[in-house]
Amino acid sequence: MTYKAVVFDIDGTLSPVLSWLDFTKALGASVDRHQQIFHDYREEHITYEQSREQLIGLWQSTGRAEHSIMQKIFDAWPLDPVAPELIKSLRERHIQICLITGSFDTYAATVGRRLGVKHWYANTEFIFDEAGQLMSYNYVRDQAAEKLKQFQKFLAASSLTATDCLAVGDGPNDIELFKATGRGIFIEPAFDRDDLAGIRAAAWRHVPSLAAVHAIINP
């Protein structure tokens, strides 16, 4: 199998963390309230601006929505035990690596630093004030389309084509990467969901874990 780059999702792929809800929990805020805000936004009961204001308010209410505290949270989150060795083995073979996540830019940067990956893209940009307090964020609702745009930026920056790459992920927002590369490796989540039919159909391979990905791309 010939390829020049591998594009990884983060949540549920390189890490067991579900970053949005786990971040809320780590701050000490109500996960139930977070889920209600997201539900109301998804069902269009509230606008994007209203959902953002409510979620930022929820996080700020803990008194812990501050850059240094958030960085400690992200530093402490676990990686899949296979991830460091997998990334190391790809780097030794001069395979380029890119992280594209629907999560936060601060978290994506942290994972990139821990794994030694310089190319990373995130769907959510945190906005801090001069004192490091989290004030807002920018978020793109259509994560699959946004991931594809970010993938295209990576290709341009790396002088690659989509078919030079493998894509590894575990959720619906990876579907456009699977379609673009034609070689999407789908990691089955621990708990089944009702929104995975499309991504399963688009996948080139289905695997139970990151360890199985390691076996495929480093035979």
Predicted features and spans:
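Short, charged, surface-exposed secondary-structure boundary motifs
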Residues: 128-135, 194-204, 216-219
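Short acidic-hydrophobic, aromatic-tinged amphipathic segments that line or gate anion-handling sites
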Residues: 120-121, 204-213
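Substrate-recognition "cap/lid" segment bordering the active-site pocket of phosphatases
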Residues: 109-165
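Short, acidic loop-to-helix structural element flanking the phosphoryl-transfer center
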Residues: 68-105
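Glycine-rich phosphate-binding "P-loop"
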Residues: 63-77, 134-142
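Acidic, Mg2+-coordinating phosphoryl-transfer loop and its flanking beta/alpha structural elements
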Residues: 101-102, 162-208
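Surface-exposed amphipathic alpha-helices with a cationic face
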Residues: 84-92, 147-148, 152-159, 179
